[in-house]
Structures are given as C-alpha cells and as structure tokens.
Regions:
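Short hydrophobic-acidic sequence motifs that mark active-site Asp/Glu residues
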Residues: 87, 97-99, 144-146, 186, ...
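Conserved structural core of kinase catalytic domains
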Residues: 102-104, 120-176
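Juxta-kinase regulatory segment immediately upstream of eukaryotic protein kinase catalytic domains
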Residues: 1-76
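Catalytic activation segment of kinase domains across protein kinase-like and atypical kinase folds
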Residues: 102, 178-212
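C-terminal effector/catalytic modules and regulatory tails appended to multi-domain proteins
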Residues: 3-4, 11, 15, 41-43, ...
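Catalytic micro-motifs at enzyme active sites that drive phosphoryl/nucleotidyl and oxygen chemistry
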Residues: 76-81, 87, 131-136, 176-183, ...
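ATP-binding glycine-rich loop module of kinase domains
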Residues: 45-50, 73-125
Length: 212
C-alpha cells in the first residue's frame, strides 16, 4: 500500500492533535482552491464539470501526488469489515477503526473535512485523523478517516446521551438526538452513534455538526 498506515496508528498527544486539525484544514483549503481552478479550466472548454466532479478529480490528483491514494481493491487491507452506516463503511484493526465515507450526509469532501474539525473540537475523546482517499481511477473518491476503537462498548441510552451533552454545555432541542449551545448545533446523537464503555464513560463516535 502506498500510504503509511503504521505511522497513522501511532500514539499521538494533544499537540499532535492540534497539528492534525491544522493539517485537515490545510487539505480542505487546498482542495477548495484546486476545485475552483479545475472548474475554471473546464468552463473554458466545451465540457461542463460540476463542482462535485471538480472536487472529486482534484482530490484524486492530490491524493496520488501526496501518497494518500488507496485503491478500492486495497480497502480491505485496512482491517476487518464491521457494521456500516448510511455514510461510512467500517473496518477495524486492533485498537483502530477506519471509516470510508461516501459523502452521503456531507455532500462534499470539503464539507466533511470541516465537520471533522468541528467534531475534533467538541469530542476530542473520539478524535478523527484523516488518512487519505479511497476510490477507483476517475470514479467516486471517498475520504478515509481513522478513530480509536471504543472497547467493550454498547449503545448509550437517550437519557445517558442527554446527560452527557448537558455536562459539556449543550441543551437538548425539540428533536430527538439534537443539541445546541451558543456556538454549535449537533444532531443525529442516537444510540448507534454514541457508545458507553464498561466504565460508564460516554463516547460520541459519529455526529452531524454545524457552526451557528
């Protein structure tokens, strides 16, 4: 495989997490810039290219330049397939979970990366690292994220989720699994996305987030 998986799995401290958030932001900025250039060049010709397609091709080229491209036939090398959701295919290796994201909820790579940064700020215990992009040449490109595995976990109950979110300063809204404070709105906090370990600690492993 062309990407450095062993390095991505190594232990990281708070300073390294700050650096990772900065790296993700820089990747998002670069993809935004490249997509605009790609669209402009395509617009000068006869073939119209959508923003989504421009972003996809820009991400593929960027990943191949940076050694972050994961061919789809190598995705199973990430780990053992696990229970997948609407947006993520899950692979587990030792203490690590890899998520191959199909962008169903976020709609674009840049949107997803920006959401990852927000998640990392609000829920640092389930910090996401960006590994690279998986896909077939000139077809769908999917970001690959890494998260620590929550061991011996079970789904948290709605009451446990509400109690946890209140403890970190969020108020429950009118809809189930939706919370907000004066900076962020977080939703889809349902039991499948929030886990409780054997010590009773709560972990938000997946959430939809927007800045207010």
């Amino acid at each position: 495989m062309k990407y450095e998986l062993s390095q991505s799995i190594s232990q990281r401290g708070i300073g390294e997490k700050d650096a990772e958030n900065q790296r993700i932001a820089e990747i998002a900025d670069e993809l935004r810039r490249r997509s605009q250039v790609y669209e402009a060049k395509s617009g000068a010709g006869q073939e119209h290219v959508s923003h989504f397609d421009a972003e996809q091709r820009s991400a593929e080229l960027y990943a191949k330049e940076k050694g972050m491209w994961i061919p789809m036939d190598e995705v199973f090398d990430l780990g053992l397939p696990g229970a997948s959701g609407n947006e993520n295919d899950i692979y587990t290796r030792e203490d690590t979970v890899f998520k191959v994201n199909n962008l169903l909820n976020s709609g674009s790579i840049v949107n997803l990366l920006e959401k990852v940064i927000l998640h990392n700020s609000i829920f640092p215990d389930t910090f996401y690292y960006f590994i690279g992009f998986a896909g077939y040449d000139r077809r769908s490109v999917m970001p690959v994220l890494q998260q620590d595995l929550v061991k011996d976990a079970q789904p948290a109950t709605p009451i446990e989720i509400e109690t946890y979110m209140a403890a970190i300063g969020f108020t429950k809204k009118n809809y189930e699994g939706r919370f907000a404070n004066n900076m962020y709105e977080v939703w889809d906090l349902v039991p499948r996305n929030v886990l409780k370990d054997k010590d009773g600690d709560i972990y938000v492993v997946d959430a939809e987030i927007k800045r207010l």
